[in-house]
Amino acid sequence: MRMIDIIEKKRDGKSLTKEEIEFFVNGYTHEEVPDYQASSLAMAIFFQDMNDEERAALTMSMVNSGEKIDLSDINGIKVDKHSTGGVGDTTTLVLAPLVAAVGVPVAKMSGRGLGHTGGTIDKLESVKGFNVEISEKDFIKLVNDNQVAVIGQSGNLTPADKKLYALRDVTGTVNSIPLIASSIMSKKIAAGADAIVLDVKTGSGAFMKTLDDAEALAHAMVRIGNNVGRNTMAIISDMSQPLGNAIGNALELKEAISTLKGNGPKDLTELVLTLGSQMVVLAEQATSLDEARQMLIDAIKTGKALNKFKTFLSNQGGDDSIVDSPEKLPSAKYQVEFKAKKDGYITEIIANEIGVASMMLGAGRQTKEDVIDLGVGIVLNKKVGEHVEKGENILTIHTNTKEIDDILYKLDNSITIESKGEAPTLIHKIITE
């Protein structure tokens, strides 16, 4: 088999066989296929697309390129949730203990944040003593005993994806549905999930800016999952403004705790119940989404979900007293109010700009080496569609420095007030095929 023949075949719009895709992925992983041929094939895929069989083959070739996490010793159906990323996306912190409280095993592998999106692990490390560097054996035992545990990402999962991702970044082939879908799904499958729930974001703070693109990606990932024996569902949710009210590590953890107590922001609570219902159904703990939703609402009302979160924290060395006393979490020295300059309705809060402002305060990393300031960030007091009066506080900046003119300038350009406005739709679609 020759790489040039595979490139020409795809260039001419023909379908590649499973063997041809495996030949490319194995060759590229082991440096037998040079970058220039790999980028040529990526560009051919970008223009000619791939059918469902090709996408499934590409995904599984990337899964098989490295180590795989074996979670077969965990009882029950392991359901993983993946979000395509956003700003203030606190869902995992609420979802994991919530679905665990109704019997869904959550074996979560999480990363750290880079850029304007915070990683789940950064948020959890706001809790004194919390440790994600646990052995696979301990991880499995924790999930069997308590239904939920979080571990840091392992080094050698999907090396083919890492190489291809870096190449796409510099060759103009990032925005290709088959390449994005296989990249995301290969990581989830290699991490041992039996079933997968996807939260595909759309809007200004999302990778997929338009609803059509988000829908195409959601369908692609759901089909890949179902074609390789992993039950998969997706929802398309709004990320034109930040999710919930808090952006920043300890601030988001406080918000997660109040959501588990039943006092969280409306949008975060709704998204968690929608995603959680799918996880409960895929884990076969309920037969319908309505039944699953009611189970989750009850787990919040009775305090079961909150207790599960406490146990989860203490199991991994964390100080669980922060659940009852969130003021023990890291906090910033100063709180600066950002006030409305006129009366009207908020029509826009640009999600990624708010994320960047939060990163500039120290809540995110610009490079992998950066140390995060866990206490800083931004808390929204108003959301899109809400009325404000001149001089009313729109958001509060939690900062450890008084030198924030550049941040105030950025916020000024990220929030729009007009004479009328309405709240965006939170959940656009549910995709099951």
Swiss-Prot record:
Q: How is the cofactor bound?
A: Binds 1 K(+) ion per subunit.
InterPro entries per record: Glycosyl_Trfase_fam3, Glycosyl_Trfase_fam3_N_dom, Glycosyl_Trfase_fam3_N_dom_sf, Nuc_phospho_transferase, PYNP-like_C_sf, PYNP_C, Pyrmidine_PPas_bac/euk, Pyrmidine_PPase_CS
What keyword terms does UniProt attach to this protein? Glycosyltransferase, Metal-binding, Potassium, Transferase
An example Gene Ontology CC term for this record:
cytosol
What GO terms are given for molecular function?
Answer: 1,4-alpha-oligoglucan phosphorylase activity; deoxyuridine phosphorylase activity; metal ion binding; thymidine phosphorylase activity; uridine phosphorylase activity
Catalytic class of the enzyme: transferase
Positions contributing to phosphate binding: K81, H82, S83, T92, K108, M109, S110, T120
Q: Where does substrate bind?
A: R168, K187
Cofactors named for this entry = K(+)
Spell out the reaction equation it catalyses: uridine + phosphate = alpha-D-ribose 1-phosphate + uracil; thymidine + phosphate = 2-deoxy-alpha-D-ribose 1-phosphate + thymine; 2'-deoxyuridine + phosphate = 2-deoxy-alpha-D-ribose 1-phosphate + uracil
* Keyword set includes Glycoprotein: no
What positions does the entry give for K(+) binding?
G88, T90, L243, A246, E255
Q: Which SMART domains match?
A: PYNP_C
> Which family, according to the similarity comment?
Belongs to the thymidine/pyrimidine-nucleoside phosphorylase family.
Quaternary assembly: Homodimer.
What the protein does?
A: Catalyzes phosphorolysis of the pyrimidine nucleosides uridine, thymidine and 2'-deoxyuridine with the formation of the corresponding pyrimidine base and ribose-1-phosphate.
Name of the protein: Pyrimidine-nucleoside phosphorylase
